[in-house]
Amino acid sequence: MSMTPREIVSELDAHIIGQNEAKRAVAIALRNRWRRMQLPEDLRQEVTPKNILMIGPTGVGKTEIARRLAKLANAPFIKVEATKFTEVGYVGKEVDSIIKDLTDVAVKLVKSQAVEKNRMRAQDAAEDRILDVLLPPAKDQWGNVQESDNSSTRQVFRKKLREGQLDDKEIEIDVAAQVSVEIMTPPGMEEMTSQLQSLFEGMSPNKTKKRKMKIKDALKVMVDEEAAKLVNPEELKQQAIEAVEQHGIVFIDEIDKICKKGEHSGGDVSREGVQRDLLPIIEGSTVNTKHGMVKTDHILFICSGAFQVARPSDLLPELQGRLPIRVELKSLTKEDFERILTEPNASLTLQYRELMKTEGVEIEFTKDGISKIAESAFRVNEKTENIGARRLHTVLERLMDGISFDASERSGEKIVIDEKYVQAALNDVVENEDLSRFIL
């Protein structure tokens, strides 16, 4: 991650409106990962990540920041829901599985990078295999391959292959047969399932089977096969574990749902027990995964929650201490809604315009129309539950319902969505609180 904090914020701005404080905190945390790697080895071990707690109502951009961060980080990244885990000793997923899943993500990431690195060599080897099918080498009477005298013909075919002239020609090739072993186990035993699957798949011999396919498809399959041959699995595991330990990022959503609310007591195994299990992982411990032992000392944890019923102070004091950076995300205003409808790279209005364009219908959202949509969503949020920007999805879906249904019969038309159109479509539902509670 060599992007500067300003570049990271700029990238997030293209998809998320407002919440500059949260963007800055995340950008600094990401950049600090890179800064730490530039330090001398002895000092590097002493610099631990400053974990983040994002606090804000639902629908203001907490999860979206995580999604965009995953694409930007180019590092092992996993997003989990705190409510999915149970305390050790109960049926359900244990907190350790976060690190196990993160390591699986890292193995896939490192493998894809290694395959990409070897793609040129793999491409040449795959082309040779296809040319061997198209131009079988001559053999002598004892079955030995003779020195080829058709090198010029082979070069002509290689040129055609690279130019795509042979793409639609069908050939029969030998491809590795994928051995698939399905094992059914009770919930909470996913680790045992994956170990048994690996065991049985490792015991089966490497078989090939003949398949007939177009050359362009065969080339993709063969490039992947050849690239996989050039990769050392043991080396990959070591690189993946190092990537997790030095660059891993864990995003834990809905952390407020595992808070102990007030003086509540009882056998709720998904609350305080889960917090206690999270403590050693966030503080730094060693987790045993199927790829090897992983130290969590330098993994960055970003936690988020709405904290509408519970408060951050309801978290265990030790856990609060391990989340030193607090960021509060603001509730969205009508002006924010207007910007969300128009400014992001893939804004909602753009999505609907492009969807209807596939049917030959042109949609135009006027400025006053967008303002009215934003106002309607904001009013419904005020009168009923405030679900933030997610309300725009329900309002727009209601608004576009008729157009979406009739679009295939209205090809060639231009539909202007202005203030009057929005008022006619939404006014009854927005004004009637009972209707808006159930429909919007």
Swiss-Prot record:
Subcellular location: Cytoplasm
Keywords: ATP-binding, Chaperone, Cytoplasm, Nucleotide-binding
Binding residues annotated for ATP, in chain numbering: I17, G59, V60, G61, K62, T63, E64, D253, E318, R390
Entry-linked InterPro entries: AAA+_ATPase (IPR003593), ATP-dep_Clp_protease_ClpX (IPR050052), ATPase_AAA_core (IPR003959), Clp_ATPase_C (IPR019489), HslU (IPR004491), P-loop_NTPase (IPR027417)
A GO molecular-function descriptor: ATP binding
GO CC annotation: HslUV protease complex
Pfam families: AAA (PF00004), AAA_2 (PF07724)
GO BP terms in the entry: protein unfolding; proteolysis involved in protein catabolic process
Family: Belongs to the ClpX chaperone family. HslU subfamily.
Free-text function comment from the UniProt entry: ATPase subunit of a proteasome-like degradation complex; this subunit has chaperone activity. The binding of ATP and its subsequent hydrolysis by HslU are essential for unfolding of protein substrates subsequently hydrolyzed by HslV. HslU recognizes the N-terminal part of its protein substrates and unfolds these before they are guided to HslV for hydrolysis.
NCBIfam families per the UniProt record, alphabetical: hslU, PRK05201.1
Binding partners and assembly: A double ring-shaped homohexamer of HslV is capped on each side by a ring-shaped HslU homohexamer. The assembly of the HslU/HslV complex is dependent on binding of ATP.
Protein name (Swiss-Prot/TrEMBL): ATP-dependent protease ATPase subunit HslU
